[in-house]
Each structure stands twice: as structure tokens, then as C-alpha cells.
């Protein structure tokens, strides 16, 4: 699906990976996260091949939910806090409070838009060097899209980069570098 791709992301940049469905955006992101292996060429992040070493510097929001819907939001925050040394529990709680979401809510009791927001909160609560966000605004209403984009802008470090994939180009043009 991908040929002759050369991608160099500078720190502090907000980069869009734009294109129609089926154009290789998710494949690129899976290569960057080590979920797929290239058939030719190499992939490196900060000089390392994607894997355990890069998991500590990359915060990844997949295009599909990967959380147990029976869990309470508080339990998921506990899990992320235990799993990621760079997870900022205070930041996650502040973002939840801004949404008026109870940490005692189970994921399955939340709307699709609010489940997406919880996943985004988890991703953006890490002090990562690279945030890779796969279609974070797909399938949610325009108000949720605005919240998601504003949350990303307000919560990534200027020392970090954001790579956001989408086919909804008009919705994110204003935030891209």
C-alpha cells in the first residue's frame, strides 16, 4: 500500500496525515507503532525501531476502541497510571472534570462520543514526545470534533509532535502547521 514514503517529523509540530479512506494512513500509523512490519525499508523513531523502546516516547490513539467497556473510567486511569510512567493522573482527572464525566461511569454506559473522549484523555495525559492519533474525529458529531481538537491543542507539549490522520480535512486545517 505504501511506496517510497519518507517522513521526518520535527518536534513541536502538528502534522496532518491526510487522505481518503484506503490511502494508507492507518497502515503508516501501524508501521510507526510496530504493529506492522515493513516488507522493505526501515522505520525509526528517535533512532529506534518501533517497539518497547519507542513505547515510552510515543502515545498512540488507535482508530478503534481497545478498552474493556465493562471497566469504570477510574479503573482505566489506574491501569494507565500503573502501566505508563509518564501518565499524568492529575491531567486526566482535570480533563474528565471539564467534560463533566464521572470517573465511576462504566465505558459501556457512555455515548460513543464520550468513549472517544475518554480514549483521547488517556492518550493526551501522557508526557510523550510523539502523539500518534488515528482518525480521532471520525464518527463523532461536530461539537465532539471541536472538543477533541481543542483538547489535543491544549494538552500536547510544545516539545512534542502530533501526527493526526483523518479524511475530514476541512475540520482540521485550522490546527495544522
Please report, for each region that a protein language model flagged, where it lies by residue.
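ABC-family P-loop ATPase nucleotide-binding domains
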Residues: 63-119, 126
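Helical segment within the ABC ATPase nucleotide-binding domain
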Residues: 145-158
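Walker A (P-loop) phosphate-binding loop of ABC-type ATPase nucleotide-binding domains
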Residues: 20-24
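Helix-to-loop junction immediately C-terminal to a conserved catalytic motif
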Residues: 33
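Catalytic Walker B motif of ABC-type/P-loop ATPase nucleotide-binding domains
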Residues: 131-135, 140
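Conserved ABC transporter NBD signature motif
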Residues: 40-54
